[in-house]
């Protein structure tokens, strides 16, 4: 019987005691931190690396997202990094030698108003210019892709069409983290759990290490990949980040036979739904409007999301919700990430992904690793510098991002 069970994730990597010093310390053991460690080792030959996680590996937003992967963003800069990320997703199962159930089942982004229609068609054309696969579908074509959706005109927000990205899809989030962790461990990276960073060692305006609950660790370079707690880490280091953290809720239903063949998203009414490989419906809601670090949210957000979901999918009316939870999303004013050097020498930051963090996992790791190794940004993340908030060179991606998952 034991031979039939999946390998316990802790057997996939070592759990060493932290060494006194490393070339690079990455704060945050989620998808982005692990991907950064992997690409540092693979692309740049830097293996004397520690990934520090204050809890268990990938127990933060990596364990709490709705697993949607897409790249159909409006502006050139965001389309560039998300399309790079999607191309990396497509090769990672073979590269990491781990089946994390990447399913390119397509993503529909619904339009409910004439304004939605105009913006959606604009985005489809922009995607085509950037080499991103995108189509505009009529309501009847939407019904062909997703037969269970209600395209009647007698609901509050009738479906007037949708954008469709066939290469988009979902993946098993826990397995993604385990795959990166296993491969990084094989390359010599130390993955250290239950090790919270409580402060930074500095020599003037240069970081030289971190203080943790498991002792002091010296480092040549330090990277922050703490998602919703990035502003807290930055404050400990002595600078500010222009981000706000909000709870973002999601929920799952009981198990069903396969009924939902794709991923459906509606920014207008904040319904984001797919069916996981085991059969449960995975649904995302809108963010709670208040700032906070709690991993749960207000019930009315879920209530409104469920009402809208049942209108779009009448078949869900008798489904039972098993559990709800929340993650902490760190949002910037232009709805795009910060992957950048900081005012502190040898300290780098990757944050501000908002609700796009999971889909950007490989791209974030790829570009942050390049930035750390070369002390300068890759062309893909150069537009996402911290300085853009001083110069005013923002990239307003709210039309394609907002709180979309």
Swiss-Prot record:
Give the record's subunit note: Heterotetramer composed of subunits alpha (SoxA), beta (SoxB), gamma (SoxG) and delta (SoxD).
Under the heading InterPro entries, the entry gives:
FAD-dep_OxRdtase, FAD/NAD-bd_sf, Rhodanese-like_dom, SoxB
Per its record, how is this protein called by name?
A: Sarcosine oxidase subunit beta
Task: Identify which cofactors the protein needs according to its UniProt entry.
Answer: FAD; FMN
Disulfide bonds, paired cysteine numbers: none
Q: Which family does it belong to?
A: Belongs to the SoxB family.
| Annotated GO MF terms | nucleotide binding; sarcosine oxidase activity
Report the enzyme's class at the first EC level: oxidoreductase
Cofactor binding note of this UniProt entry: Binds 1 FAD per subunit.
The GO annotation for biological process reads: tetrahydrofolate metabolic process
Q: Where in the cell is it found?
A: Cytoplasm
Catalytic activity reported? sarcosine + (6S)-5,6,7,8-tetrahydrofolate + O2 = (6R)-5,10-methylene-5,6,7,8-tetrahydrofolate + glycine + H2O2; sarcosine + O2 + H2O = formaldehyde + glycine + H2O2
Enzyme Commission number(s) from the entry: 1.5.3.24
Residues annotated to bind FAD: 31-32, 53, 61-62, 66, 68, 197, 354, 357, 359
Sum up the protein's function in the record's words.
In the presence of tetrahydrofolate, catalyzes the oxidative demethylation of sarcosine to yield glycine, 5,10-methylenetetrahydrofolate and hydrogen peroxide. In the absence of tetrahydrofolate, catalyzes the oxidative demethylation of sarcosine to yield glycine, formaldehyde and hydrogen peroxide.
Q: Which GO terms describe its cellular component?
A: cytoplasm
Pfam families per the UniProt record, alphabetical: DAO
Name the principal localization, coarsely classed: cytoplasm
What UniProt keywords apply to this chain's record, in alphabetical order? Answer: Cytoplasm, FAD, Flavoprotein, FMN, Nucleotide-binding, Oxidoreductase
Record PTM Tele-8alpha-FMN histidine, positions in chain:
173
